[in-house]
Amino acid sequence: MAKVPDMFEDLKNCYSENEEDSSSIDHLSLNQKSFYDVSYGPLHEGCMDQSVSLSISEISKTSKLTFKQSMVVVSTNGKVLKKRRLSLSQSITDNNLEAIANDSEEEIIKPRSAPFSFLSNMTYHFIRIIKHEFILNDTLNQTIIRANDQHLTAAAIHNLDEAVKFDMGAYTSSKDDTKVPVILRISKTQLYVSAQDEDQPVLLKEMPEINKTITGSETNFLFFWETHGTKNYFISVAHPNLFIATKHDNWVCLAKGLPSITDFQILENQA
């Protein structure tokens, strides 16, 4: 069984959003460190673990401050008490700070549960083809094959010449380098796997060449590739809770899980 290699050395050099933000702001760094650099005198022990309310004048003399993602309220020992995501262009005011400090409900922001509107508004840039002519098998040892001109299916086969061979192209986004977006193309063709809705078959769509930049409605061509040991998962960028899946006596589709099969083995060098 081929070992899934560590891929995307190219992605390790991607800059983070914080680095991009800090270079574009003259008087105030929005890196996480800047929230802790404000100098204050020591607090009494009884004040520990209480939220610290900061006014605009204490943070900066700049009259208007904008930021991209979120701000936090922390205790004096560094423990995060509350997180709040605001508008991309919303100014921070004293009222914002008071509302966050006094809000009894803590909002936990999880990058992996980013809403569709956020992911679909991101721009993905093509890096390179990272895998050539590999085969996908599900956990029932079924192999993905062509059902017709537009659809794929899974079946137990004896001749690997019947299997669909895929190429995998890697993309990156400056806004999120924690995931691995890829595009799947049938080898030696210009047919690309395209997602639809839940329980709907994935489609094979022809494009004259691989998209160098993908955004908006075109994200249905992208999938987040995740690996766990020898298991590989392909999560739709357009529908982040749905996986490429096989289903008994059905076409390859998008599904959340059982009874569909969402984990695959990649077989390389089968030409």
Curated annotation (Swiss-Prot):
Family matches, as Pfam families: IL1, IL1_propep
Protein name, as recorded: Interleukin-1 alpha
Biological role: Cytokine constitutively present intracellularly in nearly all resting non-hematopoietic cells that plays an important role in inflammation and bridges the innate and adaptive immune systems. After binding to its receptor IL1R1 together with its accessory protein IL1RAP, forms the high affinity interleukin-1 receptor complex. Signaling involves the recruitment of adapter molecules such as MYD88, IRAK1 or IRAK4. In turn, mediates the activation of NF-kappa-B and the three MAPK pathways p38, p42/p44 and JNK pathways.
Listed Gene3D superfamilies: 2.80.10.50
Modified residues (N6-acetyllysine): K82
Cross-referenced CDD domains: beta-trefoil_IL1A (cd23295)
Protein species of origin: Macaca mulatta
Location(s), subcellular: Nucleus; Cytoplasm; Secreted
Key words of the record: Acetylation, Cytokine, Cytoplasm, Glycoprotein, Inflammatory response, Mitogen, Nucleus, Phosphoprotein, Pyrogen, Secreted
PTM annotation (Phosphoserine): residues: S87
GO BP annotations, alphabetical order: cellular response to heat; cellular response to lipopolysaccharide; cytokine-mediated signaling pathway; fever generation; immune response; inflammatory response; positive regulation of canonical NF-kappaB signal transduction; positive regulation of cell division
PTM note: Acetylated within its nuclear localization sequence, which impacts subcellular localization. Proteolytic processed by CAPN1 in a calcium-dependent manner. Cleavage from 31 kDa precursor to 18 kDa biologically active molecules.
Residue ranges, annotated region (Nuclear localization signal (NLS)): 82-86
Domain of life according to the entry: Eukaryota
